[in-house]
């Protein structure tokens, strides 16, 4: 039987060099994300979101990034969920994109702010009706007694709002505004390439690029 200690692969698909890296991290992310799309990876917009609660306990979960530009990385959720409560207490987060098929990771850290109501409304209106009803039906992260309770709430809100449910006041977007972004490319013998962009107003393009030891 294979033991956990024996599970390993040697990464050799690509390299990451300072000379080839984009001058700003958003352009570099766009480049890698488009390569993930071209490789037809399943849901390349999935990312791990890590937060810390008022009690100092960390928490992580998978969410979907729904917008990326020079301002940051946007996701949407229930503001009253555990992640929402964490961010209310400590408005900082870490993100991780992991594209194992390309032997790549992108790590992002920064402060978090809510998106505007207009931006949240616009995205909410683009969602399927069932997902919009679900945002009303689910009191996210609270204990319920059964699946039947959730389905009853879904039915009640569907009857109430029909095909045009409005955005709940407790549901909307967050933007992670990065101060550091690390691009990790797997390499042979665990001597991986790691380039980190650090926000620096005095630097060209507003970012410095450094190589980290693997």
UniProtKB/Swiss-Prot annotation:
Coiled coil: none
Source species: Burkholderia multivorans (strain ATCC 17616 / 249)
Alphabetical keyword list: Flavoprotein, FMN, Oxidoreductase, Pyridoxine biosynthesis
Binding positions (substrate): 8-11, 66, 123, 127, 131, 190-192
Cofactors: FMN
Annotated catalysed reactions: pyridoxamine 5'-phosphate + O2 + H2O = pyridoxal 5'-phosphate + H2O2 + NH4(+); pyridoxine 5'-phosphate + O2 = pyridoxal 5'-phosphate + H2O2
Name of this chain's protein: Pyridoxine/pyridoxamine 5'-phosphate oxidase
Pfam families: PNP_phzG_C, PNPOx_N
Cofactor note: Binds 1 FMN per subunit.
